[in-house]
Amino acid sequence: EINLSVICGGKYSNMFYAFLSQLQTKHSTDNINPDYLIDYPGFSSIYNIPLNIPYFENDGSWLGIDFRGENELEAHENAIKLARLITSKIEQIANTQSQSTIVIFIPNEWQNFENFINKEESFDLHDYVKAFAASKGIATQLIREKTLEDSLTCQINWWLSLSFYVKSLRTPWILNNQEKNTAYAGIGYSVSKIKDKSEIVIGCSHIYDSNGQGLKYKLSKIDNYFLDKQNNPFLSFKDAFQ
Protein backbone atom coordinates (compact mmCIF):
# COMPACT_ATOMS: atom_id res chain seq x y z
CA GLU A 1 0.00 0.00 0.00
CA ILE A 2 0.98 3.64 -0.51
CA ASN A 3 0.47 6.04 2.39
CA LEU A 4 0.09 9.79 2.29
CA SER A 5 0.48 12.32 5.07
CA VAL A 6 -0.84 15.86 4.70
CA ILE A 7 0.06 19.35 5.90
CA CYS A 8 -2.82 21.74 5.24
CA GLY A 9 -4.41 24.84 6.73
CA GLY A 10 -7.55 24.13 8.74
CA LYS A 11 -9.94 26.18 6.60
CA TYR A 12 -8.77 24.37 3.45
CA SER A 13 -8.90 20.82 4.83
CA ASN A 14 -12.35 19.87 3.55
CA MET A 15 -11.60 21.15 0.05
CA PHE A 16 -8.15 19.58 -0.10
CA TYR A 17 -9.37 16.21 1.16
CA ALA A 18 -12.03 16.19 -1.56
CA PHE A 19 -9.36 17.01 -4.15
CA LEU A 20 -7.05 14.18 -3.05
CA SER A 21 -9.97 11.75 -2.90
CA GLN A 22 -10.51 12.26 -6.63
CA LEU A 23 -7.47 10.05 -7.14
CA GLN A 24 -9.63 7.08 -6.15
CA THR A 25 -12.32 7.68 -8.79
CA LYS A 26 -12.68 7.63 -12.57
CA HIS A 27 -12.22 10.74 -14.72
CA SER A 28 -12.90 11.20 -18.41
CA THR A 29 -10.57 13.11 -20.72
CA ASP A 30 -13.57 15.01 -22.12
CA ASN A 31 -11.68 14.80 -25.41
CA ILE A 32 -8.92 17.08 -24.11
CA ASN A 33 -5.43 16.29 -25.46
CA PRO A 34 -6.68 13.12 -27.22
CA ASP A 35 -3.30 12.47 -28.83
CA TYR A 36 -1.78 11.27 -25.58
CA LEU A 37 -4.33 11.48 -22.75
CA ILE A 38 -6.61 8.56 -21.87
CA ASP A 39 -9.37 8.22 -19.29
CA TYR A 40 -8.20 7.98 -15.69
CA PRO A 41 -9.68 4.75 -14.18
CA GLY A 42 -8.78 5.31 -10.51
CA PHE A 43 -5.55 4.77 -8.58
CA SER A 44 -5.95 1.12 -7.55
CA SER A 45 -7.10 0.13 -11.05
CA ILE A 46 -3.97 1.62 -12.60
CA TYR A 47 -1.28 0.54 -10.15
CA ASN A 48 -2.96 -2.46 -8.51
CA ILE A 49 -2.17 -1.11 -5.05
CA PRO A 50 -4.28 0.87 -2.56
CA LEU A 51 -3.63 4.56 -1.87
CA ASN A 52 -4.29 5.57 1.74
CA ILE A 53 -5.37 9.20 2.15
CA PRO A 54 -5.74 10.33 5.78
CA TYR A 55 -8.92 12.05 6.90
CA PHE A 56 -8.48 15.57 8.19
CA GLU A 57 -10.26 14.91 11.47
CA ASN A 58 -8.73 12.78 14.23
CA ASP A 59 -5.84 11.45 12.15
CA GLY A 60 -2.21 11.97 13.12
CA SER A 61 -1.20 11.80 9.46
CA TRP A 62 -3.04 15.05 8.69
CA LEU A 63 -1.49 18.09 10.38
CA GLY A 64 -2.99 21.55 10.38
CA ILE A 65 -0.87 24.59 9.65
CA ASP A 66 -1.97 28.19 10.03
CA PHE A 67 0.27 31.05 9.00
CA ARG A 68 -0.30 34.75 8.55
CA GLY A 69 2.48 37.16 7.75
CA GLU A 70 3.28 39.52 10.60
CA ASN A 71 2.99 43.20 9.67
CA GLU A 72 6.02 44.17 11.74
CA LEU A 73 8.25 41.75 9.82
CA GLU A 74 9.79 42.23 6.39
CA ALA A 75 8.49 40.00 3.57
CA HIS A 76 11.67 37.91 3.54
CA GLU A 77 11.44 37.39 7.31
CA ASN A 78 7.88 36.11 6.96
CA ALA A 79 9.01 33.83 4.12
CA ILE A 80 11.72 32.23 6.26
CA LYS A 81 9.31 31.91 9.18
CA LEU A 82 6.78 30.10 6.96
CA ALA A 83 9.45 27.78 5.55
CA ARG A 84 10.63 26.82 9.03
CA LEU A 85 7.06 26.22 10.16
CA ILE A 86 6.51 23.83 7.24
CA THR A 87 9.76 21.96 7.87
CA SER A 88 8.87 21.59 11.55
CA LYS A 89 5.59 19.95 10.49
CA ILE A 90 7.51 17.66 8.14
CA GLU A 91 9.76 16.57 10.99
CA GLN A 92 6.74 15.98 13.21
CA ILE A 93 5.19 13.65 10.64
CA ALA A 94 8.48 11.92 9.82
CA ASN A 95 8.97 11.01 13.47
CA THR A 96 5.79 8.91 13.43
CA GLN A 97 5.03 8.18 9.74
CA SER A 98 8.31 7.05 8.21
CA GLN A 99 6.83 5.31 5.16
CA SER A 100 4.66 8.02 3.66
CA THR A 101 4.82 10.81 1.11
CA ILE A 102 4.07 14.16 2.73
CA VAL A 103 1.64 16.31 0.74
CA ILE A 104 1.80 20.05 1.47
CA PHE A 105 -1.01 22.41 0.46
CA ILE A 106 0.16 25.90 -0.59
CA PRO A 107 -2.76 28.39 -0.52
CA ASN A 108 -2.87 31.56 -2.60
CA GLU A 109 -2.54 33.68 0.54
CA TRP A 110 1.08 32.50 0.91
CA GLN A 111 2.02 33.80 -2.53
CA ASN A 112 3.91 36.83 -1.17
CA PHE A 113 6.10 34.54 0.91
CA GLU A 114 7.04 31.97 -1.73
CA ASN A 115 10.22 33.68 -2.91
CA PHE A 116 12.42 36.72 -2.56
CA ILE A 117 15.74 38.09 -3.76
CA ASN A 118 17.79 40.63 -1.84
CA LYS A 119 21.43 41.65 -1.55
CA GLU A 120 22.20 38.76 0.79
CA GLU A 121 20.36 35.78 -0.64
CA SER A 122 17.71 34.40 -2.94
CA PHE A 123 14.94 32.18 -1.58
CA ASP A 124 12.31 29.89 -3.05
CA LEU A 125 9.85 28.13 -0.74
CA HIS A 126 9.46 25.09 -2.99
CA ASP A 127 13.23 24.59 -3.28
CA TYR A 128 13.78 25.18 0.45
CA VAL A 129 11.21 22.56 1.47
CA LYS A 130 12.38 20.06 -1.15
CA ALA A 131 16.03 20.43 -0.14
CA PHE A 132 15.19 20.02 3.55
CA ALA A 133 13.08 16.91 2.95
CA ALA A 134 15.55 15.34 0.51
CA SER A 135 18.39 15.72 3.02
CA LYS A 136 16.36 13.56 5.42
CA GLY A 137 15.19 11.05 2.82
CA ILE A 138 11.58 12.24 2.98
CA ALA A 139 9.37 12.31 -0.13
CA THR A 140 7.21 15.43 -0.49
CA GLN A 141 4.63 16.80 -2.90
CA LEU A 142 3.69 20.49 -2.87
CA ILE A 143 0.28 21.33 -4.34
CA ARG A 144 -0.78 24.92 -4.90
CA GLU A 145 -4.36 26.12 -4.56
CA LYS A 146 -4.51 27.01 -8.25
CA THR A 147 -4.09 23.30 -9.09
CA LEU A 148 -7.39 22.58 -7.35
CA GLU A 149 -9.04 25.21 -9.55
CA ASP A 150 -7.63 23.80 -12.80
CA SER A 151 -10.18 22.30 -15.20
CA LEU A 152 -7.78 19.59 -16.48
CA THR A 153 -8.95 17.11 -13.86
CA CYS A 154 -8.07 13.94 -15.75
CA GLN A 155 -4.58 15.12 -16.64
CA ILE A 156 -3.87 16.30 -13.09
CA ASN A 157 -4.93 12.97 -11.59
CA TRP A 158 -2.66 11.07 -13.97
CA TRP A 159 0.26 13.34 -13.08
CA LEU A 160 -0.38 13.24 -9.34
CA SER A 161 -1.03 9.50 -9.13
CA LEU A 162 2.19 8.73 -11.00
CA SER A 163 4.09 11.09 -8.71
CA PHE A 164 2.83 9.31 -5.58
CA TYR A 165 3.57 5.90 -7.08
CA VAL A 166 7.16 6.81 -7.97
CA LYS A 167 7.80 8.59 -4.67
CA SER A 168 6.88 5.38 -2.87
CA LEU A 169 10.02 3.94 -4.55
CA ARG A 170 8.14 1.87 -7.10
CA THR A 171 8.93 1.63 -10.82
CA PRO A 172 5.87 2.27 -13.04
CA TRP A 173 7.40 0.88 -16.24
CA ILE A 174 10.66 -0.11 -17.94
CA LEU A 175 11.68 0.13 -21.58
CA ASN A 176 11.89 -2.98 -23.75
CA ASN A 177 14.91 -3.97 -25.82
CA GLN A 178 17.41 -1.72 -24.09
CA GLU A 179 21.14 -2.35 -24.13
CA LYS A 180 22.16 -3.88 -20.81
CA ASN A 181 25.34 -1.85 -20.68
CA THR A 182 23.57 1.47 -21.23
CA ALA A 183 23.39 4.06 -18.46
CA TYR A 184 21.52 7.36 -18.39
CA ALA A 185 22.40 10.63 -16.70
CA GLY A 186 20.44 13.84 -16.25
CA ILE A 187 22.14 17.14 -15.53
CA GLY A 188 20.65 20.39 -14.23
CA TYR A 189 21.97 23.68 -12.95
CA SER A 190 21.11 26.64 -10.76
CA VAL A 191 22.31 30.19 -11.38
CA SER A 192 22.41 32.71 -8.57
CA LYS A 193 20.26 35.79 -9.22
CA ILE A 194 21.67 37.89 -6.40
CA LYS A 195 22.84 41.24 -7.75
CA ASP A 196 26.49 42.24 -7.60
CA LYS A 197 27.60 38.66 -6.97
CA SER A 198 29.31 36.26 -9.30
CA GLU A 199 27.16 33.53 -10.80
CA ILE A 200 27.13 30.25 -8.95
CA VAL A 201 26.38 27.11 -10.91
CA ILE A 202 25.40 23.88 -9.20
CA GLY A 203 25.53 20.66 -11.17
CA CYS A 204 22.86 18.14 -10.20
CA SER A 205 22.86 14.76 -11.90
CA HIS A 206 20.96 11.52 -11.52
CA ILE A 207 22.29 8.27 -12.95
CA TYR A 208 20.42 5.03 -13.54
CA ASP A 209 20.64 1.88 -15.64
CA SER A 210 18.69 0.88 -18.76
CA ASN A 211 15.83 -0.44 -16.60
CA GLY A 212 15.49 2.83 -14.72
CA GLN A 213 16.89 1.25 -11.57
CA GLY A 214 19.83 1.99 -9.29
CA LEU A 215 18.99 5.69 -9.20
CA LYS A 216 21.74 7.84 -7.70
CA TYR A 217 21.99 11.59 -7.17
CA LYS A 218 25.05 13.79 -7.11
CA LEU A 219 25.06 17.47 -6.17
CA SER A 220 28.21 19.53 -6.44
CA LYS A 221 29.47 23.05 -7.04
CA ILE A 222 30.89 23.64 -10.51
CA ASP A 223 33.75 26.12 -10.81
CA ASN A 224 35.05 25.78 -14.37
CA TYR A 225 31.99 26.30 -16.54
CA PHE A 226 31.44 28.38 -19.66
CA LEU A 227 28.35 30.20 -20.95
CA ASP A 228 26.87 29.98 -24.44
CA LYS A 229 25.22 32.86 -26.31
CA GLN A 230 22.01 32.37 -24.32
CA ASN A 231 23.93 32.42 -21.03
CA ASN A 232 23.31 28.71 -20.44
CA PRO A 233 26.16 27.19 -18.43
CA PHE A 234 28.04 24.15 -19.71
CA LEU A 235 30.44 21.88 -17.85
CA SER A 236 34.11 21.86 -18.66
CA PHE A 237 35.53 18.54 -19.85
CA LYS A 238 37.14 17.97 -16.44
CA ASP A 239 33.94 18.64 -14.49
CA ALA A 240 31.89 16.46 -16.84
CA PHE A 241 34.38 13.60 -16.50
CA GLN A 242 34.27 13.79 -12.70
Task: Please provide the spans of the model-predicted regions.
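Long, low-complexity, intrinsically disordered terminal regions
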Residues: 1-242
